[in-house]
Amino acid sequence: MEQTWRWYGPNDLVSLADVRQAGATGVVTALHHIPNGEVWSVEEILKRKAIVEDAGLVWSVVESVPIHEDIKTHTGNYEQWIANYQQTLRNLAQCGIRTVCYNFMPVLDWTRTDLEYVLPDGSKALRFDQIEFAAFEMHILKRPGAEADYTEEEIAQAAERFATMSDEDKARLTRNIIAGLPGAEEGYTLDQFRKHLELYKDIDKAKLRENFAVFLKAIIPVAEEVGVRMAVHPDDPPRPILGLPRIVSTIEDMQWMVDTVNSMANGFTMCTGSYGVRADNDLVDMIKQFGPRIYFTHLRSTMREDNPKTFHEAAHLNGDVDMYEVVKAIVEEEHRRKAEGKEDLIPMRPDHGHQMLDDLKKKTNPGYSAIGRLKGLAEVRGVELAIQRAFFSR
């Protein structure tokens, strides 16, 4: 696997020198300063590429070229936003950058309720608490009909939890959910958030798939033409939330994408920390079935708790993800490609890491502190080395 590291650009608290010392050779980045929907110019792409290469690294993957909400709702200037997206792909290809990670999650990107969940060893992790999320949705956001998405027990627990929250607890929970986590392309006030949810009141799973199909049928032929590989990132968490449909959550969703636009440019990001939240997702089977279309991997683990919809981000080699079998399946896919004469490695990043050691004293981006990711990258690197030596050294 190609070892990569997500970098948020010149304002990132982790420097490119740090990235190189961590052992990564590739950088995963995006032009976050360009507004959603606008074209990424060749000039801006080359400027970022030069910064990365001057540090002795390569720009391996774009994560992400964001998709404007008008495209997801099929309203407003969606045709112009699609045309802009097509041009951005052409410009990236012209600059030699050919792997693009993206997602089709409506309104919210990845979502957590607690950004400082303290683990037994004193390090901090990200957590999604189903009961806290229910308390937010029913008692702070007050979304009409939200009760239908929860069990009677969850509704009672959420009311009890809300009753114990201080004003600061409520404000922190609201910020964590709607203000935008690292990599998220939108942040909202509570009123803005309600208005954006309202835009989806008539959009169910079938309609969102229909809108996604319009996007894929416009984008994938351009990607194929210019040699770009699109790698969709799964929903996080991989299930409907806030009354919003989610359509990249299961192996059935992956198959729907392939059936909708059967092109090798139409591929996947295997994010084990997202897909792995669902106990019914067999990650190794997903890799084996769709291996030729996996162009990027995020390798981390999560741990489901007593409520199976509550989870926290576990250490990379612990939790519910069998990292050994996952890495073995990815390495096997790389060797299958090699046998076909393809030498390209699959870019891998350790995704998130625990806030630990000296980083506990520093300001860090949630999930993106340096030392926790350094640890995760080293652990996954070790697993891969052992697999390569044990099975492919001859």
Swiss-Prot record:
The gene is uxuA. Its cofactor is Fe(2+); Mn(2+). Pfam families: UxuA (PF03786). Its EC number is 4.2.1.8. This is Mannonate dehydratase. The keyword Transmembrane does not apply. It comes from the Bacteria. NCBIfam families: PRK03906.1, uxuA. InterPro entries: Man_deHydtase (IPR004628), Xyl_isomerase-like_sf (IPR036237). GO terms for molecular function: ferrous iron binding; manganese ion binding; mannonate dehydratase activity. Belongs to the mannonate dehydratase family. Catalyzes the dehydration of D-mannonate. It catalyses: D-mannonate = 2-dehydro-3-deoxy-D-gluconate + H2O. Pathway: Carbohydrate metabolism; pentose and glucuronate interconversion. The keyword Transferase does not apply. Keywords: Iron, Lyase, Manganese. GO terms for biological process: D-glucuronate catabolic process.
